[in-house]
């Protein structure tokens, strides 16, 4: 094996001297001007925000009233904007229950039919279909 020599350089740790923060000097006039601007801006924003909030609330209530009327008349739309007709839940459940009851019987009858066909010797004819 080859001998590999590594040279290690000694590094002196950096000494970081703390920096003193100097407070910034502000005049009393500067502070007053900033306070005046802030209060003016806040006052205007508050007035506009209240007016906008009231307007949005009224619009929202009007939209909800329209939706309620549409639902009562059976003219409601679903979330995708498609027309939706009012359907009784009882009508929806009945076909599903019937389908579930018929499904196992249908599968049994198909299997029984195939067994009967195979037993009768007509299996190649059924397979060709």
From Swiss-Prot:
Region span, Disordered: 1-129
Annotated Basic and acidic residues bias: 34-94
Biased composition (Low complexity): 1-13, 117-129
The protein's name: Uncharacterized protein T28D9.1
